[in-house]
A protein has these predicted regions:
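Hydrophobic, aromatic-enriched alpha-helical segments typical of multi-pass transmembrane helices
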Residues: 1-238, 243-246
Length: 246
């Protein structure tokens, strides 16, 4: 949904080059104002769903073995911050289409939006590090039934590492480390998509397993209750017969 709004509708992939002048940037946002507005609206709705996704991951993490509580709530907190970073950037781009502005103001707004979108790597890095560490704690000592497979922990660690190049985009106006470059845009974007899809699939599988386990536990609990009730009934009948004999 986010890619539909950001890429297909708004046309922000590939991103506007950092070397564009204020006049060129103003012309771009004026010519495509309607599609950018609509694309940003769709992207805003999609960005909000990241909060629910982070909450779902947190619930799953709280079921893991080991002391993962702090890691789970860290994931929830930085997931919420991640949503804000997306939303603020999208609102800035929307406001650039709202009225005619000085070219230098447009440049400053666009720079700020892209730095928010690309350069703040600390939150996704901390989120993936927290998830990966929790997975390793859950799978240590050869636990037979981990929530997520151990390789998912390595995936999260690698994702954290591959997000790192975006941090230095502020030093470059062109090349692979600019905000539209290979290492700061296309690589993290691809990695982010793979990570989201992989973790979502793992959550769906885990959800089914946890639900089946909960149903089995519930069935076992119901059976135990029935056995206790049956024993109580047998004891009551035995006591009644004993009194009748007396």
């Amino acid at each position: 949904m986010f890619l539909a709004g950001f890429w297909v509708i708004a046309g922000f992939i590939p991103p506007p080059a950092p070397k564009l002048t204020g006049e060129q940037l103003g012309q771009l946002f004026t010519q495509h104002a309607v599609r950018i507005r609509i694309g940003m609206i769709v992207s805003l709705f999609a960005s909000a769903l990241l909060a629910s996704w982070s909450a779902a991951i947190t619930i799953v993490m709280l079921r893991m073995r080991g002391r993962v509580g702090a890691l789970a709530y860290t994931n929830l907190a930085v997931g919420a911050l991640f949503v804000l970073e997306f939303i603020i950037s999208l609102i800035i781009w929307q406001s650039m289409t709202y009225r005619s502005r000085d070219p230098q103001v447009l440049l400053a707004m666009n720079d700020t939006a892209w730095f928010l979108f690309v350069c703040i790597t600390s939150t996704p890095m901390l989120q993936t590090f927290a998830i990966g560490t929790a997975i390793f704690l859950d799978t240590q000592d050869g636990h037979p039934d981990p929530i997520f497979p151990r390789w998912a922990g390595y995936l999260n660690y690698w994702v954290a590492v591959l997000f790192t190049p975006g941090t230095i985009a502020v030093f470059f106006h062109d090349g692979p480390f600019a905000w539209n470059g290979l290492f700061t845009w296309y690589l993290p974007l691809t990695v982010f998509a793979i990570w989201m899809i992989t973790m979502s699939v793992l959550m769906l599988k885990t959800g089914g397993a946890l639900e089946a386990g909960a149903q089995a536990y519930s069935a076992g609990t119901d059976l135990a209750d029935e056995v206790r009730q049956l024993r109580a009934e047998v004891a009551r009948l035995a006591a009644g017969r004993k009194e009748a004999r007396l």
